[in-house]
């Protein structure tokens, strides 16, 4: 059986500081995400989902198998969304839509930050 793997980070653990510390990255990546991958691989052995893609597992499994597969997917996506230099200010149609809705990019950032701080999830 091919096992799922913890993806390689595209940045050093300290590259996101001060927004996210190396300690936070190492804990979240090296402990949380690594545990989801290990649990997923253990739960797959002998199951009907052994050998299936991550997407097939997420769409068909339940309980712990679903939870660990979904967390592996979510975290893998999360790491790809992070970059040491940030995304910067958008341009073109996206910036126009932001300015139309929020009045300015800075107002959007403030509203987004406030909303994000009030939510919990992974």
Feature roles, as predicted:
Residues 1-122:
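Feature for soluble, non-membrane regions of globular proteins
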